[in-house]
Structure formats: structure tokens, C-alpha cells
């Protein structure tokens, strides 16, 4: 099954810990008490949201930033403030963190809802999480009473190669290789 097939069937929820854009999930966000529309420009990404909320470390932030600037807490807050066409001095740290929290909530709600639907459709009893966000998913699924194995916790650095290995195995089984 290709990624296109998975998207068509709803089996691929294409959102991630690092490169997803903030407006891919948010149209409006509550900032400092005001519902505020979000710019569609690429001002910040999911890595900024997860970084300022403590879900990933600076070392985990392994992709280029939206503005080419440094990967620091302050720089991530500034990028997040740009999502509502603002500067950090205008909305403050709390406003930028509201944007981050709203994005992560939308992202995790989407993932949890789709995983529940897919598990029901396929009669699955548990899931496997892998990748840089596996610890986020493991907690999300535990809170949602979904049994989950965190490959990163179980296999360490070798877990990074497991999704590629799974694709190769699937390709072999379907005769692609």
C-alpha cells in the first residue's frame, strides 16, 4: 500500500513532531483572551510548538527552522508569535505558548481520533509508536486507554530504522522487491 493509498483510506495521518506547519491544523487560536485568525504563511512549525512545550529538546529539533534562525526557546517563541502576524513583544511568552498548546492539542486530538477509528475498522487491539514523537504518542494513547508499544523506548537508536525496515518488508511481501 502506498502513502497515497493510505491517505485515501484514512490510514495515514500526515502530521509530525518536526515539520508540520502550524496553519495545517489551526485556522484560529485564542491568544491573550482574543480569538485570532492564523496566517497561512510558513512562519513556524510543529518543532517550535513541541520545543516550547518541552516535548522535544533542542537536540531533537533536527530540521531547518522556518526562518533560518537558531533553534532556541526564545527563537521558537518568536516564530510562533509570527503565526498571528505578531512579534513576541506584542503577545508575550504566554501568548506564543497558547499557540503552541492549541496546535499540539489539535494534532493529538486528530491522531487519537483517527487511531481509534482505524483500530475499530481493523479490529486492532494495540498499536506501535516509533520516531521522534513516540513518547508523546505513548502518553497520549495511555491517557486514551489504548495499549501502545514505544519502539524507541524498547529498541533505542535502532528504532529509527524500523519504519524503513517495515516498508521494505511490506514491499517484499507484495512483490515490489
Range-by-range predicted roles:
Residues 1-177:
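Helical "lid/coupling" subdomains associated with nucleotide-phosphate turnover
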Amino acid at each position: 500500500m502506498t502513502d497515497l493509498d493510505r491517505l485515501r483510506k484514512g490510514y495515514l495521518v500526515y502530521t509530525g513532531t518536526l515539520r508540520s506547519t502550524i496553519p495545517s491544523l489551526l485556522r484560529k487560536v485564542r491568544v491573550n483572551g482574543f480569538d485570532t485568525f492564523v496566517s497561512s504563511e510558513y512562519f513556524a512549525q510543529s518543532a517550535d510548538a513541541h520545543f516550547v512545550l518541552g516535548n522535544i529538546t533542542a537536540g531533537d529539533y533536527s530540521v531547518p527552522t522556518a526562518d533560518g534562525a537558531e533553534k532556541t526557546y526564545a527563537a521558537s517563541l518568536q516564530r510562533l508569535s509570527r503565526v498571528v502576524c505578531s512579534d513576541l513583544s506584542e503577545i508575550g511568552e504566554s501568548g506564543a505558548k497558547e499557540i503552541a498548546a492549541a496546535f499540539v492539542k489539535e494534532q493529538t486530538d486528530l491522531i487519537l481520533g483517527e487511531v481509534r477509528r482505524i483500530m475499530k475498522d481493523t479490529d486492532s487491539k494495540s498499536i506501535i509508536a516509533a520516531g521522534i514523537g513516540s513518547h508523546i504518542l505513548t502518553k497520549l494513547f495511555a491517557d486514551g486507554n489504548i495499549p501502545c508499544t514505544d519502539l524507541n523506548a524498547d529498541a533505542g537508536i535502532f528504532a529509527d530504522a524500523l519504519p524503513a525496515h517495515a516498508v521494505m518488508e511490506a514491499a517484499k511481501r507484495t512483490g515490489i522487491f
